[in-house]
């Protein structure tokens, strides 16, 4: 029998969720709970779509998969994993509040409307080593980044 575990953390201005399964799992999410703007898959593959529709997002992950899921807000969705999977969701707290999201590839200029989140690994940012699920509100300054093969996202409130 396959197992599926879901975790949720409400942060100051957003929420994070994480899903971990050993594969071959189907998960359904009700429209009233669908606040995920971005999905970050760090392990595994699967597909996701609106229930009873033919169009799916298929994620075949050899590295990392970052998906904009805004079109799924307010819709019933279904996710099927093809193999063991570990993924995160960046969620808005208010469906009327939009965010821009991206994975960083190196050093960058921050701003005070943004948050940084570590999804995998142990990057060093401005001399501080981060762990998985560490997050911080950014300031209007330069951030020196050594990724060390980590996966780090920056999300900006629009």
Model segments located where?
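Jelly-roll (double-stranded beta-helix
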Residues: 1-158
């Amino acid at each position: 029998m396959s197992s599926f575990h879901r975790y949720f953390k409400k942060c100051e201005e957003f929420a994070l969720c994480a899903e971990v399964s050993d594969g071959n799992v189907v998960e359904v999410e009700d429209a009233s709970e669908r606040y995920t703007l971005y999905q970050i898959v760090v392990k595994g593959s699967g597909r996701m779509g609106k229930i009873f529709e033919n169009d799916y997002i298929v994620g075949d992950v050899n590295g990392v998969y970052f998906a904009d899921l805004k079109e799924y807000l307010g819709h019933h969705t279904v996710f099927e994993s093809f193999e063991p999977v570990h993924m995160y969701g960046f969620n808005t707290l208010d469906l009327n509040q939009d965010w821009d999201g991206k994975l960083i590839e190196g050093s960058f200029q921050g701003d005070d409307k943004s948050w940084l989140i570590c999804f995998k690994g142990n990057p060093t940012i401005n001399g501080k080593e981060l762990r998985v699920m560490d997050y911080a509100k950014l300031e209007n300054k330069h951030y020196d980044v050594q990724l060390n093969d980590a996966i780090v996202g920056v999300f900006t409130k629009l």
